[in-house]
Protein backbone atom coordinates (compact mmCIF):
# COMPACT_ATOMS: atom_id res chain seq x y z
CA UNK A 1 0.00 0.00 0.00
CA UNK A 2 1.49 3.29 -0.98
CA UNK A 3 1.33 6.23 1.35
CA UNK A 4 0.26 9.56 -0.05
CA UNK A 5 1.46 12.80 1.37
CA UNK A 6 -1.30 15.28 2.12
CA UNK A 7 -1.79 17.99 -0.48
CA UNK A 8 -1.21 21.53 0.69
CA UNK A 9 -2.14 24.22 -1.81
CA UNK A 10 0.56 26.80 -2.44
CA UNK A 11 0.29 30.05 -0.50
CA UNK A 12 -1.51 32.79 -2.41
CA UNK A 13 0.34 36.08 -2.84
CA UNK A 14 -0.98 39.37 -4.18
CA UNK A 15 1.70 41.65 -5.64
CA UNK A 16 0.62 45.30 -5.87
CA UNK A 17 3.06 47.40 -7.83
CA UNK A 18 2.42 50.24 -10.27
CA UNK A 19 5.74 49.72 -12.09
CA UNK A 20 5.00 46.91 -14.55
CA UNK A 21 8.62 45.69 -14.71
CA UNK A 22 8.89 45.51 -10.92
CA UNK A 23 5.53 43.74 -10.70
CA UNK A 24 6.42 41.18 -13.38
CA UNK A 25 9.83 40.53 -11.80
CA UNK A 26 8.39 40.02 -8.31
CA UNK A 27 5.54 37.86 -9.56
CA UNK A 28 7.82 35.66 -11.68
CA UNK A 29 10.26 35.22 -8.79
CA UNK A 30 7.47 34.15 -6.46
CA UNK A 31 5.98 31.75 -9.01
CA UNK A 32 9.38 30.08 -9.42
CA UNK A 33 9.33 29.48 -5.66
CA UNK A 34 5.96 27.72 -5.92
CA UNK A 35 3.59 30.48 -4.84
CA UNK A 36 0.29 31.17 -6.57
CA UNK A 37 0.52 34.84 -7.53
CA UNK A 38 -2.06 37.47 -8.42
CA UNK A 39 -1.01 40.89 -9.65
CA UNK A 40 -2.49 44.38 -9.30
CA UNK A 41 -1.26 47.70 -10.67
CA UNK A 42 -3.12 49.86 -8.16
CA UNK A 43 -5.33 49.88 -5.07
CA UNK A 44 -8.56 49.42 -7.06
CA UNK A 45 -7.26 46.26 -8.73
CA UNK A 46 -5.90 44.98 -5.42
CA UNK A 47 -9.26 45.45 -3.68
CA UNK A 48 -10.99 43.50 -6.45
CA UNK A 49 -8.62 40.59 -5.85
CA UNK A 50 -8.99 40.84 -2.07
CA UNK A 51 -12.79 40.69 -2.37
CA UNK A 52 -12.64 37.51 -4.46
CA UNK A 53 -9.52 35.55 -3.51
CA UNK A 54 -8.29 34.39 -0.09
CA UNK A 55 -4.83 35.96 -0.06
CA UNK A 56 -2.17 34.75 2.38
CA UNK A 57 0.35 37.50 1.71
CA UNK A 58 0.02 41.00 0.25
CA UNK A 59 3.23 42.50 -1.12
CA UNK A 60 2.93 46.18 -1.96
CA UNK A 61 5.20 49.04 -2.92
CA UNK A 62 5.37 51.38 0.08
CA UNK A 63 5.35 54.42 -2.21
CA UNK A 64 2.09 53.35 -3.85
CA UNK A 65 -0.52 56.09 -3.81
CA UNK A 66 -3.13 55.16 -1.18
CA UNK A 67 -0.89 52.43 0.23
CA UNK A 68 -2.20 53.07 3.75
CA UNK A 69 -5.75 52.78 2.43
CA UNK A 70 -4.82 49.48 0.82
CA UNK A 71 -3.50 48.11 4.12
CA UNK A 72 -6.71 49.12 5.89
CA UNK A 73 -8.92 47.59 3.20
CA UNK A 74 -6.86 44.39 3.19
CA UNK A 75 -7.32 43.98 6.93
CA UNK A 76 -11.06 44.68 6.63
CA UNK A 77 -11.59 42.09 3.89
CA UNK A 78 -9.06 39.52 5.10
CA UNK A 79 -7.88 40.06 8.68
CA UNK A 80 -5.38 37.17 8.59
CA UNK A 81 -3.53 38.38 5.48
CA UNK A 82 0.08 39.28 6.16
CA UNK A 83 1.32 42.51 4.58
CA UNK A 84 4.85 43.14 3.35
CA UNK A 85 5.95 46.54 2.07
CA UNK A 86 8.75 46.86 -0.45
CA UNK A 87 10.70 49.76 -1.88
CA UNK A 88 11.83 50.10 -5.48
CA UNK A 89 14.51 47.43 -5.90
CA UNK A 90 16.17 49.40 -8.68
CA UNK A 91 17.18 51.91 -6.04
CA UNK A 92 18.82 49.15 -3.96
CA UNK A 93 16.53 49.53 -0.99
CA UNK A 94 15.94 46.79 1.54
CA UNK A 95 12.58 45.07 1.83
CA UNK A 96 10.71 46.01 4.99
CA UNK A 97 8.08 43.83 6.61
CA UNK A 98 5.22 45.27 8.63
CA UNK A 99 3.95 42.88 11.28
CA UNK A 100 0.31 43.14 12.29
Give the location of each predicted region.
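Non-catalytic signal-transmission and effector/linker regions of two-component phosphorelay proteins
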Residues: 1-18, 23, 27, 44, ...
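Conserved phosphotransfer microenvironments
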Residues: 59-78, 88-95
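Conserved dinucleotide-binding and phosphotransfer motif residues
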Residues: 32-33, 77
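Short, well-ordered alpha-helical microsegments
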Residues: 23, 47, 67-68
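Alpha-helical interaction/dimerization surfaces of two-component signaling modules
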Residues: 28-30, 49
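Acidic, metal-coordinating helix/loop segments flanking the phosphotransfer/catalytic sites
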Residues: 39-57, 95-99
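His-Asp phosphorelay/catalytic-motif detector in bacterial-type signaling
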Residues: 9-10, 54-56, 77-85
Amino acid sequence: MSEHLPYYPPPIVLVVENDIFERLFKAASLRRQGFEVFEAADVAEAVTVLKNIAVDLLISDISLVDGAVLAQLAKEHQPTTQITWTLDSRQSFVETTVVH
